[in-house]
């Protein structure tokens, strides 16, 4: 869904049934460049980028949803005013990502709240296609925040992630020179 206002994705399911593969589709749910986005009670399994992805959007709620066996369970990217709560992110490479990346139509992600989620046992090997930025995310990640401002993370249950519980970083750590 691109460039829409008032998107409601409620009680939907996307799943790649052949297990984690780089040839799986990139996204389970993918609203971008949109306003007033609601993802509620959805299930995303097996995406080679993000199970639940919201990008370059504003006024977002992702709640009561399940993301499993994706590279990134839930990803909020280059977005404004998002609440991500009461979700389960498990057995992904990384549970929840809050990124702001260059060269996208909307820059300066801000005012993101991640709370009352379970980001547990994110232990799936990274199977993103080569060249994807999420291909750099280490297996066993609970939450990564990169290059955003005014991000609040509170009252989440995180366990069994193995590599990192919560990481705050800036983009330069991930840039490479040609």
Report residues per predicted region:
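Flexible, solvent-exposed coil segments and beta strand-coil junctions
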Residues: 132-135
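Right-handed parallel beta-helix
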Residues: 5-18, 35-50, 58-72, 80-94, ...
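Beta-sheet-rich non-transmembrane sensory/scaffold domains
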Residues: 139-142, 147
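Conserved small/polar residues in nucleotide/adenosyl-binding loops
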Residues: 169-176
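Short, recurring structural edge motifs at helix starts
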Residues: 100-104, 141-142
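C-terminal amphipathic alpha-helical segment
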Residues: 112, 122-129, 140-141
């Amino acid at each position: 869904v691109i460039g829409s206002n008032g998107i409601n994705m409620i009680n939907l399911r996307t799943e790649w049934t052949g297990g984690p593969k780089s040839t799986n589709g990139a996204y389970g749910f993918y609203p971008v460049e949109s306003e007033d986005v609601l993802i509620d009670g959805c299930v995303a399994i097996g995406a080679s980028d993000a199970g639940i992805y919201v990008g370059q959007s504003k006024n977002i709620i992702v709640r009561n949803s399940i993301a499993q066996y994706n590279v990134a369970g839930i990803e909020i990217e280059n977005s404004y005013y998002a609440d991500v709560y009461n979700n389960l992110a498990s057995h992904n490479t990384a549970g929840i990502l809050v990124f702001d990346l260059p060269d996208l139509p909307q820059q300066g992600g801000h005012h993101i709240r991640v709370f009352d989620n379970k980001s547990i046992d994110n232990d799936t090997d990274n199977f993103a296609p080569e060249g994807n930025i999420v291909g750099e995310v280490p297996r066993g990640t609970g939450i990564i925040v990169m290059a955003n401002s005014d991000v609040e993370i509170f009252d989440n249950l995180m366990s069994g992630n193995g590599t990192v519980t919560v990481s705050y970083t800036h983009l330069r750590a991930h840039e490479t020179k040609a």
